[in-house]
């Protein structure tokens, strides 16, 4: 795997997460979907959004399995012209829980990520500056395991 294994895996099933629409978000749902959680640093703008667009493109390349990976952006919503339409691709959400804070990007306009299993366990982490193409390989492996 390209991502760093989280040991022990963290159970996110009880972590309170709320979408910007006010509805609760569950990491473990009816569908067997993996969740890629984007953890932006302060002030997600042009560079951060460019990386997230590359992640979305990596998801699209999964073709028929693309719907087996949910994209969740956990933090203050991005801003600027580049953020237009972002919420159509990513689920915008927030949490008061510190469970994933040690994986969050620290630098302004940067983003890190965590891959969560269909069972709600944080399994792999990707620090700020990760390569979306290599992340795509991990996503491909994950959805193949789930089939």
Task: Pin down the residues of each PLM region.
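Conserved helix-turn-beta segment immediately C-terminal to the redox Cys motif
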Residues: 52-73
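Short, internal strand/loop/helix patches
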Residues: 69-118
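Extracytoplasmic/secreted cell-surface and envelope-processing proteins
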Residues: 47, 81-82, 123-124
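Conserved beta-strand and immediately adjacent loop positions that scaffold enzyme active sites
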Residues: 14, 35, 112
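Extracytoplasmic
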Residues: 31-33, 66-68, 108
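Short active-site neighborhood of thiol/selenol oxidoreductases, capturing the structured segment around
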Residues: 29-55
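N-terminal "domain-start" segment that seeds a small globular fold
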Residues: 1-28
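Thiol-/selenol-based redox modules, centered on thioredoxin-like
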Residues: 98, 109-110, 115-147
């Amino acid at each position: 795997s390209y991502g760093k294994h989280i040991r022990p895996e963290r159970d996110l099933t009880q972590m309170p997460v709320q979408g910007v629409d006010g509805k609760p978000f569950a990491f473990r749902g009816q569908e067997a979907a993996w969740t890629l959680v984007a953890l932006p640093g302060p002030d997600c703008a042009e560079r951060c959004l460019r990386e997230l667009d590359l992640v979305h493109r990596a998801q699209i390349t999964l073709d028929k399995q693309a719907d087996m990976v949910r994209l969740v952006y956990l933090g203050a919503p991005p801003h600027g012209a580049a953020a237009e339409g972002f919420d159509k691709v990513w689920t915008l959400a927030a949490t008061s829980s510190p469970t994933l804070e040690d994986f969050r990007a620290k630098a302004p306009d940067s983003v890190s990520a965590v891959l969560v299993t269909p069972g709600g366990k944080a399994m792999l982490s990707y620090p700020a500056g990760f390569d979306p193409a290599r992340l795509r390989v991990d996503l491909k492996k994950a959805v193949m395991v789930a089939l």
